[in-house]
Amino acid sequence: MKKFDPSLYFITDSTNYTEEEFLYRVEEALKGGATLLQLREKNKSTREYIDLAEKVHAITKRYNVPLIIDDRVDVALAIDAEGV
C-alpha cells in the first residue's frame, strides 16, 4: 500500500457550491499540490455521496492523490477509496 503524505491535507465541503464548481475546486487543490484529499459530506444521501465520491475519485486518481472518505465505510468500499 502506498504511504499517505499528509503534508497538504485537503478536506472538502461541497455545501455552498454547485457540483461543477466543487469539482473544479477539488482539481485546483490537487493542481496546487494537495497530497491527500478527504471527502466530507454530512448532508448527502448514500446515493448522492457515492455519485460525488466517484467523480472526485476519478480526479484524485489522475493526480495520484489518495482519497479518504469521512465516516462512511460503505461509500469508501463502493468506490474503492484509499481510506476512511
Predicted regions and their residues:
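Conserved N-terminal beta1-alpha1 strand-loop-helix module at the mouth
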Residues: 1-84
